[in-house]
């Protein structure tokens, strides 16, 4: 066993002595040591219940004849961090999580790992670590929260609250109505109830094969999630016995399948960023052109909030992720069904008995929302290395208009609230990319303000930053190269005409190459917003969004 490094042989007497101080007995040294990587944090509703999850996981691991050791990671609640400097720490927290998990697991030579994530950057951070460490691993997420209901019976979620702010600002609802939405938008523990980033990543974790069937859709408060925990411990023991590791599971084909599900469900645009980072950790050469190829062959079968009024509880009721995959498998060339997963079985075996139970929620191949996926990769002279739009969250497929330029999210939100944006405008928020932000903050507050003011179909928004999974409308993010790297978005001037063509996958500014070259020569890189601390180091090391915004290792040659 891998853990023999710290527990076997006469020279490991000091190690065993320390381990006995934690409560271990001599007989425990013949059992696998299992890292229980938890993320219990009281301020994050998606993680507040995970201390109890950790106890259940440890009980299940002991029952399977193994020895559990629990530790915790940090985490950031993107909703609470939204709209202030806290959002700059969100994406960078992914790297801290990955590094901290790597540190604990490799320092103590564990034989296997069970990860208990749930929310936005915590799930991908743990997944990155699992691929980096590459020991047998199973994920059991905390699960989604249920949607809420206002006193009038209206179904609401977190995006409803954000949009309610814009609606109140524009006089569409009263302060009492906003308070009603606030009080009911997040009714319980769990990840926010729509197809936002947390649920998108937990669903992708399931189809990648690192989590068990049901992981993406079973609610946090559903007793079936406890059954998942028991299964996870049993499956981990099988993975250890068969030496099946994350890099055996997360192959190029598995990532294709993850993006196929993403396209079928119209997941968060953040999945592109995180899954490219996973590919990097797995040592795979995977880029945005391959994502675009997946988008072209996968129909959009399922619209979940914010693209519709359906929520994760509805997906679960309709058959869950397995039912969506089973329907997708009917189309040749969409899924790779014979690859291994954390169950110890193939994807084909995992979904064999699944079926759609509500075709209003999960559409059939014969009745898709669209013939192509719910995410699109756009390119053009404004995004030479690519940009991402959640095409399934807008009915507008082509938009052309003049730029209204803001050099930060704060500046943009103030401008929107002051009425500086009107119907037909293209809002540009720049210098918010991985380096420029730094930290590539999400633009949920501006998109929600636009939607709440009733301009969601009449105003486009472009940024080198990110969007929350709760964002909707004509929102194009991840524009690469970013402004801080001298990308075209940095060269735009007030009133320039921008064209967004979703069907043709184009993002263009209507000016000549000669004019762009002239502006590039005149452009001067702004001073970094942050020069010290973690964000200062992050800005120096982070790569572009089109490569997953991972940290580059300095060249010591």
Curated annotation (Swiss-Prot):
Modified residues (N6-carboxylysine): 121
Catalytic residues of the enzyme: 468 (proton acceptor)
GO cellular component assignments: cytosol
UniProt KW Magnesium keyword: yes
Keywords, alphabetical: 2Fe-2S, Amino-acid biosynthesis, Branched-chain amino acid biosynthesis, Iron, Iron-sulfur, Lyase, Magnesium, Metal-binding
SUPFAM superfamilies (UniProt xref): IlvD/EDD N-terminal domain-like (SSF143975), LeuD/IlvD-like (SSF52016)
Short name of any one Pfam family annotated for the protein: ILVD_EDD_N
EC assignment: 4.2.1.9
Listed pathway(s): Amino-acid biosynthesis; L-isoleucine biosynthesis; L-isoleucine from 2-oxobutanoate: step 3/4; Amino-acid biosynthesis; L-valine biosynthesis; L-valine from pyruvate: step 3/4
Binding site for Mg(2+): 78, 120-121, 442
Cofactor binding note from Swiss-Prot or TrEMBL: Binds 1 [2Fe-2S] cluster per subunit. This cluster acts as a Lewis acid cofactor.
Self-association and partners: Homodimer.
Similarity field: Belongs to the IlvD/Edd family.
Annotated function: Functions in the biosynthesis of branched-chain amino acids. Catalyzes the dehydration of (2R,3R)-2,3-dihydroxy-3-methylpentanoate (2,3-dihydroxy-3-methylvalerate) into 2-oxo-3-methylpentanoate (2-oxo-3-methylvalerate) and of (2R)-2,3-dihydroxy-3-methylbutanoate (2,3-dihydroxyisovalerate) into 2-oxo-3-methylbutanoate (2-oxoisovalerate), the penultimate precursor to L-isoleucine and L-valine, respectively.
NCBIfam families hit by this protein: ilvD (TIGR00110), PRK00911.1 (NF002068)
PANTHER family with a match to the protein in the record: D-XYLONATE DEHYDRATASE (PTHR43661), D-XYLONATE DEHYDRATASE YAGF-RELATED (PTHR43661:SF3)
Protein name per UniProt: Dihydroxy-acid dehydratase
Source organism of this protein record: Bacillus cereus (strain Q1)
